[in-house]
Amino acid sequence: MNNQTTIGILGSGTWGIALARLLHRNGHDVTVWSKFPKEIENLSATRTHPALPGLVIPETVHFTCDLQTVASGKDILLFAVPSIAIRQTAESARPFIPDGQIIVDVAKGIEPDTLMTMTEVIRDELSKDGQHDHVKLVALSGPTHAEEVALLSLIHI
């Protein structure tokens, strides 16, 4: 029986990779998504991120370009894409996100046209089909940088 928490991470930038390493280190089953196939190929092949030199991504962190793979059946889903891509990513992922899903938003910023926070943007997009009324959506924020989290120093999640 596998008691690992399954976590999908939307976004393979420095935040996504730093959190993937940290969550994996703490015993969770992690899958990272990017919409860019070449990026996923490079991460899978090298097990490193170009902006986090010298930090190795464990072999058991999974990578995919498929939204259904990263979102379906996960205990927790993290949104770690740039703020400019939050709305489009939420819209694209919506069919694969079950109602009641725990979602953690780690993107920072305000949407210029609506002045919504990223968490509000995610909720707005997910609510458009009327089937995501019970999504548990939280924001994770604080005075940290992806590079610090990637170093795994003084952090326990």
Q: Which stretches of residues belong to each language-model region?
A:
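NAD(P)+-binding Rossmann beta1-loop-alpha1 motif at the extreme N-terminus of oxidoreductases
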Residues: M1-V56, H62-C65, S92
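Short, well-ordered alpha-helix to beta-strand connector turns
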Residues: G27, T60-V61, K74, G100
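Conserved short-loop catalytic and cofactor-binding motifs
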Residues: T31, P58, V106, I110
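Residues in flexible loops and secondary-structure boundaries
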Residues: E41, A51, T60, A71-S72, ...
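Short, solvent-exposed coil/turn segments
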Residues: V56-I57, G142
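A generic secondary-structure signal marking the coil-to-beta-strand transition
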Residues: E59-T60, K136
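Rossmann-like NAD(P)(H) cofactor-binding subdomain of soluble oxidoreductases
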Residues: L67, S72, I76-L152
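Conserved small/polar residues in nucleotide/adenosyl-binding loops
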Residues: I155-I157
